[in-house]
């Protein structure tokens, strides 16, 4: 399904843990890493597509995660001209994405597996610092990643504990 402007509706998934780290997945047989993502099928809501992609790509089910946020807007990126399939109809020039911030529920990390539905999209994963993906994702996705991570940061980043200064009793945030 491609819209009238040539963009394919898609969902992106940021999975975080309680330490504010995010799941970073390595594309199958490649050296590139990204967040899980995938197309929205006809008749499917973005949330339904997210849960389907979550299972197909990462092996997680709805009971393994908690939805913390959904992006306010659809975020678009254009594909580099060399990646556009000009002979297809209609021509897809990029993706428009609705993003979801999920928290992996405690004790569910062992359920992460690849290839639950056909050919695996990924062959490795790791926890990385929250902002790491913005610098590391393929260049044409960086602006979308920057925007979505900025939107999700207040919810995903752990709030530092307040410490009381023993000398004068004032409250300080750790540096």
Swiss-Prot record:
Pfam families per the UniProt record, alphabetical: NUDIX
Molecular function per GO: mRNA 5'-diphosphatase activity
Function: Accelerates the degradation of transcripts by removing pyrophosphate from the 5'-end of triphosphorylated RNA, leading to a more labile monophosphorylated state that can stimulate subsequent ribonuclease cleavage.
The gene coding this protein: rppH
The entry's keywords: Hydrolase
Identification of the protein by name: RNA pyrophosphohydrolase
InterPro entries reported in the protein's UniProt record: Nudix_hydrolase, NUDIX_hydrolase-like_dom_sf, NUDIX_hydrolase_CS, NUDIX_hydrolase_dom, RppH
Domain Nudix hydrolase positions: 6-150
Family: Belongs to the Nudix hydrolase family. RppH subfamily.
EC numbers, comma separated: 3.6.1.-
GO cellular component, one term: cytoplasm
UniProt cofactor(s): a divalent metal cation
Gene Ontology BP annotations: mRNA catabolic process
Motif segment (Nudix box): 38-59
